[in-house]
């Protein structure tokens, strides 16, 4: 996911919401296809355990005029990362993983690096020094990997960008290593572990690992918007098997809301572990700090006021934001890459429209 700096202002809490309070949000959702920023998009708000509003616009398949809805399956890109982070923290809670231990304690075939020791924490907070994709071929998913270990083998012998634990270098590959850790420690495949311990527990009935050889019902086609604003259907397989734990999942906007709720009500990990997960990390960073699997957006002095994650890859622009004090989650999911900046802006409109923030605060990401 490309990092972009944007200033976003939240408004004062406006009291109880009603369906017509989401007029601006609905306009934002409909604007994205109308202005050809996205082909299809859906957004939603969850409050106090209930989905109180959803809206969608555009198409999941333009040629066949199939509408994009809140239950349309599409990629979620890097929103896979907080799901994977929580899985690691579940193993931590069980005493099976030490966050300060070298990764080789759990993934013995990951090489020891001359630059320094990579710990589990370093992988979770992107300070491992592992680089992102080395080529367009890797970034666009031209090859298929049968296992996460095969995917890890592509990059495991490369030099690090920096000594581990010093600076945030956002990398999906670090989360691939965490996926291998989950498999080795749990004795289950990544997909099976996530299904049993994350998606089923959160009530996420339409979430899974994207596979190029599976024909999905109700899954959106993929579209890409180039720098000139022209949108085309993504050609080829665009295989995600080289990044599954960090960006290889599909879901619906409703499932993203359910995931956020499971985080807020501590269905997946304890309140203590949640607090640990949201601690600001002692590393250099550019823009908003990264905790363990989440960006911390608030600048009110309490970083945990608003946290979330975005996602951008071929055929996807996505954002989820959680507002714990309001027991609220907002999410937007689009089937078109190249429009993530507009998606995060629309996400803040959802928060504002629902009156889910109570300080004149500024969020930067």
Regions found by a protein language model. Give the residues of each.
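Bacterial Sec-dependent N-terminal signal peptides
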Residues: 1-22
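Catalytic loop of the DD-peptidase/beta-lactamase superfamily, centered on the K-T-G motif
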Residues: 19-56, 142, 183-186, 192-196, ...
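Extracellular/periplasmic catalytic domains that process cell-envelope and extracellular macromolecules
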Residues: 37, 67, 98, 113-117, ...
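Generic structural signal for alpha-helix termini and adjacent loop/cap motifs
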Residues: 60, 94, 126, 158, ...
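Active-site helix/loop module of the DD-peptidase/beta-lactamase fold
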Residues: 75-79, 93-135, 180, 185-222, ...
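Catalytic-site signature segments of enzymes, centered on catalytic residues
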Residues: 135-216, 235, 242-257
């Amino acid at each position: 996911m490309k990092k972009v700096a944007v200033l976003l202002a939240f408004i004062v809490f406006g009291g109880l919401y009603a369906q017509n309070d989401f007029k601006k949000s609905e306009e934002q959702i409909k604007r994205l296809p109308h202005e050809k920023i996205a082909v299809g998009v859906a957004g939603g708000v969850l409050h106090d355990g209930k989905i109180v509003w959803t809206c969608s616009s555009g198409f999941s398949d333009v040629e066949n005029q199939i509408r994009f809805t809140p239950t349309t399956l599409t990629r979620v890109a890097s929103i896979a990362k907080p799901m994977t982070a929580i899985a690691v923290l579940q193993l931590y809670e069980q005493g099976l993983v030490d966050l300060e231990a070298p990764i080789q304690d759990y993934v013995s075939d990951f090489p020891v690096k001359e630059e320094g020791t990579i710990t589990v924490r370093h992988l979770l907070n992107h300070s491992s020094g592992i680089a992102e994709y080395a080529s367009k071929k890797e970034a666009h998913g031209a090859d298929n990997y049968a296992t996460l270990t095969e995917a890890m083998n592509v990059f495991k012998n490369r030099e690090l960008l920096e000594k581990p634990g010093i600076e945030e270098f956002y990398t999906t590959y670090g989360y691939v290593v965490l996926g291998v850790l989950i498999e080795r420690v749990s004795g289950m495949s990544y997909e099976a572990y996530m299904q049993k311990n994350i998606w089923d527990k959160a009530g996420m009935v339409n979430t899974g690992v994207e596979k190029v050889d599976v024909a999905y019902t109700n899954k959106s086609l993929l579209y890409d918007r180039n720098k000139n604003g022209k949108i085309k259907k993504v050609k080829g397989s665009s295989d995600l098997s080289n990044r599954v734990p960090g960006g290889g999942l599909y879901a619906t906007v409703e499932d993203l809301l359910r995931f956020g709720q499971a985080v807020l009500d501590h269905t997946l990990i304890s309140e203590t572990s949640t607090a640990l997960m949201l601690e600001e990390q002692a590393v250099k960073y550019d823009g908003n700090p990264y905790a363990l699997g989440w960006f911390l957006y608030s600048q009110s002095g309490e970083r945990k006021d608003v946290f979330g994650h975005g996602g951008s890859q071929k055929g996807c622009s996505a954002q989820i934001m959680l507002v714990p004090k309001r027991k609220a989650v907002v999410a937007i999911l689009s089937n078109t890459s190249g429009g993530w900046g507009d998606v995060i802006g629309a996400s803040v409109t959802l928060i504002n429209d629902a009156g889910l923030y109570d300080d004149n605060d500024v969020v930067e990401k």
